């Protein structure tokens, strides 16, 4: 569908969050001519990439009254995609000649380098002038009394503690999904005497010195943290429900790190029994089981819900048909190259709001969503995987690009993504520091020369 030639309309738009999604959303909205206010509860840009030593007092992060820490970054974290692949399309993630030499030049850099990149992006495009820092959004709800499509936002500034009530034409939700942890269900856990925690509260390995630790999960964090802890722990065991029931493998290169099938049960004597029949005495169980989508501020009278981590109904993972185009989300899909996708989603939202890009009718959007849900059900795919994309992300990106009238994802970026996945599976210990895709890097830098 080609962009229409309708007159451009400007709207007053609120963006919730100043992480990687919120920053590019703000830029694209302003480029399209909209008036933008970004709400950010922290004192700087960067969202989930802001590292802090602080952890929550509740190691499982289940206490609703807890003081929430808005970062899940651990000290040793490095990207699992190369920087060339990660960056926004017109602001390459390259070593910049005009910044400090203390920056991390590696292709798979630290979390600090990603944060610095986002700060550079915000500075380059003067985004901070649109941001209200230290401001928490406590309520987003339709403001029917103000006219169709209007939204009421209530927010509080950290120091003032005064509720601010404002009306906006549209809201773009960019608050991320790495704050509210998911947990595995473990038979017998209520009487197990050891320590339970979620990886949200992991920072450094030292607290686990000489301990026996079980991690649950097969995510990038489980992989990274298990190897991190193995440097100091007595034993590390990784349990994963996707592993065959008889799985028991010593991790190559380690004498104290094993892969298992899922936990079968835990007991009062401190033991953990795996589906493979192995029983060990354990000090700590760490849930590396991901996060829930969480929008505690959003009131939609049931029109947008989170059901087993399916956010919906959403058209193309972005627009709520009930409120389109006045309520949208950036950054819902996972297992993707995030920043370039955020950029395309933001361009689409900005163009739709201005009237330049048409949306289908509410009925047609709902029909497509119902068809998607039926297809997933027929394939036996659980609701919690609704937003997992993987290989399908590039078809999705192509569709977004066609709506926006911009170029599709570069071939080198696609190839780099797939090559990195192959390398990671074959060489999980070394893929970040040994690579053979120099021809793709060369192609990337040819493209980057247009912007740097």
From Swiss-Prot:
Keywords: FAD, Flavoprotein, Monooxygenase, NADP, Oxidoreductase. NADP(+) binds at residues 217-222. GO terms for cellular component: plant-type vacuole. Its EC number is 1.8.-.-. Pfam families: FMO-like. Its cofactor is FAD. Gene3D superfamilies: FAD/NAD(P)-binding domain (3.50.50.60). FAD binds at residues 17-22. Catalyzes the conversion of methylthioalkyl glucosinolates of any chain length into methylsulfinylalkyl glucosinolates. Belongs to the FMO family. This is Flavin-containing monooxygenase FMO GS-OX-like 4. It comes from Arabidopsis thaliana (Mouse-ear cress).
């Amino acid at each position: 569908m080609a962009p229409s030639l309708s007159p451009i309309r400007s709207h007053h738009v609120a963006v919730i969050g100043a992480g990687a999604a919120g920053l590019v959303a703000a830029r694209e909205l302003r480029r399209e001519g909209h008036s933008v206010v970004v709400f950010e509860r922290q004192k700087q840009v960067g969202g989930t990439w802001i590292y802090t030593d602080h952890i929550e007092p509740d190691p499982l992060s289940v206490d609703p009254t807890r003081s929430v820490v808005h970062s899940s970054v651990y000290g040793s974290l490095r990207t699992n995609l190369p920087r060339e692949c990660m960056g926004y399309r017109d602001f390459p993630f390259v070593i910049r000649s005009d910044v400090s030499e203390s920056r991390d030049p590696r292709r798979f850099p630290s979390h600090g380098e990603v944060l610095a990149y986002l700060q550079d992006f915000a500075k380059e495009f003067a985004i901070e002038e649109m941001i209200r820092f230290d401001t928490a959004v406590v309520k987003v709800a339709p403001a029917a009394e103000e006219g169709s499509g209007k939204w009421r936002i209530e927010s509080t500034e950290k120091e003032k503690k005064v509720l601010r009530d404002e009306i906006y034409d549209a809201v773009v939700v960019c608050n991320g999904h790495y704050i509210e942890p998911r947990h595995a269900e473990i038979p017998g856990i209520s009487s197990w005497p050891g320590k339970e925690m979620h990886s949200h509260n992991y920072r450094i390995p030292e607290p686990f010195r000489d301990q026996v630790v079980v991690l649950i999960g097969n995510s990038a964090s489980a992989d990274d943290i298990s190897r991190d802890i193995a440097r100091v722990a007595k034993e590390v065991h990784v349990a994963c429900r996707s592993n065959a029931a008889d799985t028991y493998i010593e991790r190559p290169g380690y004498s104290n790190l094993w892969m298992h099938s899922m936990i079968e049960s835990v007991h009062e004597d401190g033991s953990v029994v795996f589906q493979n029949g192995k029983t060990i005495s354990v000090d700590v169980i760490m849930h590396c089981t991901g996060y829930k989508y969480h929008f505690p501020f959003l009131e939609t009278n049931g029109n947008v819900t989170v059901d087993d981590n399916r956010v919906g109904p959403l058209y193309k993972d972005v627009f709520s048909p009930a409120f389109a185009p006045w309520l949208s989300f950036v950054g819902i899909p996972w297992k993707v190259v995030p920043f370039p996708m955020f950029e395309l989603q933001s361009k689409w939202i900005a163009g739709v709001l201005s009237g330049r890009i048409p949306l289908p009718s509410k009925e047609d959007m709902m029909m497509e969503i119902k068809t998607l849900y039926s297809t997933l059900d027929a394939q036996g795919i659980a609701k919690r995987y609704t937003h997992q994309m993987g290989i399908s992300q590039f078809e999705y990106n192509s569709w977004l690009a066609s709506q926006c009238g911009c170029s599709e994802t570069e071939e080198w970026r696609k190839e780099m993504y797939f090559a990195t996945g192959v390398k990671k599976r074959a060489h999980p210990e070394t893929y970040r520091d040994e690579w053979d895709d120099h021809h793709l890097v060369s192609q990337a830098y040819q493209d980057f020369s247009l912007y740097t």
